[in-house]
Amino acid sequence: MAKPAKKTGPKKAKRNVPNGVAHIQSTFNNTIVSITDTSGEVISWSSAGASGFKGARKGTPFAAQTAAEAAARRALDQGMRQIEVLVKGPGSGRETAIRALQVAGLEITLIRDVTPLPHNGCRRPKRRRV
């Protein structure tokens, strides 16, 4: 069988971005960390699933820590030093993801909770009976 041709697409140029925003979306099933510049352009991202966790383990605090470390490492390579942290969602990986960003060497200037709260909007799903 013939070998598939290797694609050599445009490589992303390393930019020097000193300030940015870390968006942490933490649900009960997964944690997604996106690090953007101040205008909102994504510089690096990672999730518990992308870090190698599957199934129920994606919702654990350790998976969130691993995802945050991976995203922070890539952001540090782009020259990022200071970040604001916006946390969204009720998941268990919120605090550990913030701590992992700090331990990785990023200076956190602000932590803001941006979890959306309905002003009595849509009807809630019925309660689970387990």
From Swiss-Prot:
Keywords assigned: Ribonucleoprotein, Ribosomal protein, RNA-binding, rRNA-binding
GO cellular component: ribonucleoprotein complex; ribosome
Disulphide linkage map: none
RNA-binding is among the record's keywords: yes
PROSITE patterns according to UniProt: RIBOSOMAL_S11
Superkingdom of origin organism: Bacteria
Biological process annotations from GO: translation
GO molecular function, one term: structural constituent of ribosome
Function: Located on the platform of the 30S subunit, it bridges several disparate RNA helices of the 16S rRNA. Forms part of the Shine-Dalgarno cleft in the 70S ribosome.
Family to which the UniProt record says this protein belongs: Belongs to the universal ribosomal protein uS11 family.
The protein's assembly and partners: Part of the 30S ribosomal subunit. Interacts with proteins S7 and S18. Binds to IF-3.
PANTHER family reported in the protein's UniProt record: 40S RIBOSOMAL PROTEIN S14/30S RIBOSOMAL PROTEIN S11
Protein name: Small ribosomal subunit protein uS11
Gene encoding the protein: rpsK
